[in-house]
Amino acid sequence: MRKKYRKVVVGGTFDRLHLGHKALLRKAFEVGKIVYIGLTSDEMVRNKPYAERILPYEHRLKDLLKFIEVNGYTNYRIIKIHTAIGFADSMKSLEAIVVSEETYKGALIVNRAREEKGLKPLDIVTIPIIKSYLGDKISSSLIRAGLIDPFGRPLHWKGNSPKDV
């Protein structure tokens, strides 16, 4: 199958790899021939909610590699990033950035930074936010807080099924 873009970028902390992360990564591999994944450094996540519970970089890298391998994806490069923009504002050959509806504004910031450096803005490929069984977005913060699992299921449900709500 022909890919729409030669080189795409996607980035994140990818802590406790959940359905939202997986949808984002799948979209990146669907549209890009080569996928550049910016994985946040340990230093960068210190101010996130429940930061003390965020898995170390090496653990998150291992989980990411396992997901990529299980899905048979090839043609990728994982790069440790130390800022929100990472390398996306300086890599001339990138064509698109894959984000969720929630992180769309970040893509606009990347494009502004690229334009300031004389680079072409990236096409923005957006996926919808993946919801948990309770209707909230699936997020690593909720998983770290012990409220949901990586599939969006509540961990302390008092009732028959979340779908009964």
Swiss-Prot record:
The annotated consequence of gene deletion is: Disruption of the gene results in CoA auxotrophy.
What's the domain of life for this entry?
Archaea
Q: What is its EC number?
A: 2.7.7.3
> What keywords appear on the UniProt entry?
ATP-binding, Coenzyme A biosynthesis, Cytoplasm, Nucleotide-binding, Nucleotidyltransferase, Transferase
Quote the Gene3D superfamilies the UniProt record gives: HUPs
What is a single Pfam family found in this protein's UniProt entry?
Answer: CTP_transf_like
Q: Which GO terms describe its molecular function?
A: ATP binding; dephospho-CoA kinase activity; pantetheine-phosphate adenylyltransferase activity
The pathway that the record names for this protein is: Cofactor biosynthesis; coenzyme A biosynthesis
**What does the UniProt entry say about where the protein is found?**
Cytoplasm
Function summary:
Reversibly transfers an adenylyl group from ATP to 4'-phosphopantetheine, yielding dephospho-CoA (dPCoA) and pyrophosphate.
What name appears for this protein in its UniProt entry? Phosphopantetheine adenylyltransferase
Origin organism of this chain? Thermococcus kodakarensis (strain ATCC BAA-918 / JCM 12380 / KOD1)
Its organism's taxonomic lineage begins at: Archaea, Methanobacteriati, Methanobacteriota, Thermococci, Thermococcales
